[in-house]
Amino acid sequence: MNNNDLFQASRRRFLAQLGGLTVAGMLGPSLLTSRRATAAQAATEAVISKEGILTGSHWGAIRATVKDGRFVAAKPFELDKYPSKMIAGLPDHVHNAARIRYPMVRVDWLRKRHLSDTSQRGDNRFVRVSWDEALDMFYEELERVQKTHGPSALLTASGWQSTGMFHNASGMLAKAIALHGNSVGTGGDYSTGAAQVILPRVVGSMEVYEQQTSWPLVLQNSKTIVLWGSDLLKNQQANWWCPDHDVYEYYAQLKAKVAAGEIEVISIDPVVTSTHEYLGREHVKHIAVNPQTDVPLQLALAHTLYSENLYDKNFLANYCVGFEQFLPYLLGEKDGQPKDAAWAEKLTGIDAETIRGLARQMAANRTQIIAGWCVQRMQHGEQWAWMIVVLAAMLGQIGLPGGGFGFGWHYNGAGTPGRKGVILSGFSGSTSIPPVHDNSDYKGYSSTIPIARFIDAILEPGKVINWNGKSVKLPPLKMCIFAGTNPFHRHQQINRIIEGWRKLETVIAIDNQWTSTCRFADIVLPATTQFERNDLDQYGNHSNRGIIAMKQVVPPQFEARNDFDIFRELCRRFNREEAFTEGLDEMGWLKRIWQEGVQQGKGRGVHLPAFDDFWNNKEYVEFDHPQMFVRHQAFREDPDLEPLGTPSGLIEIYSKTIADMNYDDCQGHPMWFEKIERSHGGPGSQTYPLHLQSVHPDFRLHSQLCESETLRQQYTVAGKEPVFINPQDASARGIRNGDVVRVFNARGQVLAGAVVSDRYAPGVARIHEGAWHDPDKGGEPGALCKYGNPNVLTIDIGTSQLAQATSAHTTLVEIEKCNGTVEQVTAFNGPVEMVAQCEYVPASQVKL
């Protein structure tokens, strides 16, 4: 999956010679009643209370309270019965010291442009410039790079951005740059990089982002639910579109059934997750597997199913291919080592009889396997995802209600019955207008690379790597543009990122917060938050419950501009403004998107009101007729008429396609591969004995809302990001709850606040991803992160030659108590604004 596709998406160079610079200072300081529309199967037009401005977000729909021009409070939307605690931090997203207020340019880049001293990136010294000046420089750099280097030197990237169908940073970035010239594209993503590549080879579809079997059917039919590295309760707080949180009602029903003994839940995880805790420790069977040994456990389960004749031979014969090729490996005929429970016990820390008992229980009745994403974010993560499918196939329940497997249960309200409604379009990143620089000569380099390997491209241009059956020659990147993303949060091994950044000529960041990505950029452009503009959004993701108006809460703050206006002005500089806007402004686009929805609805028998009526009076419409769904049911009922998208049309336990790639780290069937580093007696554990998890956070969405002081007050320890550690590990190191500690390995070091908890198995620690990077020595590689970003510690290697995805969870660390003075966190302030003490020199007089 192309990352840019997934997340779509008067020359006045004024200052060339700066004389003396002085520091100017730090920048900073009621239930819904509904009426049925008259048309058949119409949307419900909700009568909304006017107490607060209605808008949406990744964390849910809210009513915003504004006082004296400031967004001061967020209350849950009336229909959200299970609102996220994170909405309390939304006002801070608009008003905080880390807000980007003005266009800024890094000091030395302003002096020398692409010939600047790149080792100064990260020193946080910037000069404020006008919008015209900033956009002129942006345009001039695009021109220079296209003319000097060509498309192989330019990479753009986006990420989670903000909600809204129109104000889509990824799509706007993609379209604007495509109108100027070609660039390097990216494939894959950081969330599901391994699974989304292997699963289409095995079951013919990506699986990870797709709808799951409806929860009512699971609750009715399942007897055993296996949560394998999946924390439903924590992760459903935030979704891609505005969440309705209806899925939490099914979690409440699950809790009741578990308490009544009607369903047994098994959690395979080295941690007692939030979901585990919610369902009750006394009711959940906990399999605290040693980190990164899930595949040995899976193989041992498969071995038990086979050796005890508990597997479904008919399902394997009629719906699968390749079990016969997999079996010799499972039985040890290839390497002399049967992958039985006794073998797995030594690796997993789970005694052999418990493993055998788990296999028997899964085979005894209807079992739903709920797989998360964190386990595949490790070296060889493809193998775990593949083995989930193999286990489900051996059980023979794929396509039955309450049985089989799923990889997306923790995301986008999966399992909530979807409603028959409209899915709005949005602002597309594609365009049929030819670019100004219509140059498709990548000079022998690849035009698309795996996103998790883009730092490799910067550091090792020309290196040839394998990727999903293709050979990729990494391009010599010179310029990167980021909008709606924070690579210093999502990419691994930050000190390696910093080394790569020094080789780039120009970095441009478009954002609303001074993240580390912005601090390490050359040109920083202030974008509005979603609360400073108008938009539309789906309400509910897989549920498709309705459509919500996203009303502007406050005006754009300081000099922030909408991404649409930023890129419109950029495109004007190369005569593509009309091609970018298509002649429409913000409200014009919203009306077009709405009208396209009206036409779509006619084909589905769904009526939408006129836009003006919706926008001015209704603000929300709700769809009817939730539909029950069973994942893979059509395939099970008729595999000939409903084949999977694999070469055989069946589940491929053995893949000839993968085998023919001849990769030593991902072969024709799932296997156990030792990791480059692994805790509990594995490689590297003598020096760094603790496994570090860096899973999704509980109080933010990735790095979004880390700027919220309101939320940080609820979870930080001594002003630091918490590190969770088992009592035994803490005691052995003289660490107590609340201590500031240093977490370190050969790749880096961070400070964090200790939280001692028995929810974490011995040898396991956790720092949530998304913590802002706060180096004590600016842009110097190896600097101590004063706040606690775990990606300072993670390793930047691909999962395998197949997916080339992130291996964040292949990370070992040591932890020690800090003694003496601890440096204060400065990540949540703005930059040091520099003021020139010289005359500006026209660009025409400067030799660059």
Swiss-Prot record:
Enzyme Commission number(s): 1.7.2.3
Single GO molecular function: molybdopterin cofactor binding
Cofactor(s) of this protein: Mo-bis(molybdopterin guanine dinucleotide)
Positions contributing to Mo-bis(molybdopterin guanine dinucleotide) binding: 191
Pfam assignment, any one: Molydop_binding
Keywords for this protein: Metal-binding, Molybdenum, NAD, Oxidoreductase, Periplasm, Signal
Localization terms from the record: Periplasm
Cofactor comment text: Binds 1 molybdenum-bis(molybdopterin guanine dinucleotide) (Mo-bis-MGD) cofactor per subunit.
Keyword S-adenosyl-L-methionine part of the UniProt annotation: no
Main location class: periplasm
Superkingdom, natural source: Bacteria
Metal-binding recorded as keyword: yes
Post-translational modification: Predicted to be exported by the Tat system. The position of the signal peptide cleavage has not been experimentally proven.
GO biological process terms on file: anaerobic respiration
Signal peptide positions (record): 1-39
Cross-referenced PANTHER family: TRIMETHYLAMINE-N-OXIDE REDUCTASE, TRIMETHYLAMINE-N-OXIDE REDUCTASE 1
Subunit structure: Interacts with the N-terminal domain of TorC.
Function: Reduces trimethylamine-N-oxide (TMAO) into trimethylamine; an anaerobic reaction coupled to energy-yielding reactions.
Family, as annotated: Belongs to the prokaryotic molybdopterin-containing oxidoreductase family.
Listed name of the protein: Trimethylamine-N-oxide reductase 1
Source organism of this protein record: Escherichia coli O157:H7
Gene, per the UniProt record: torA
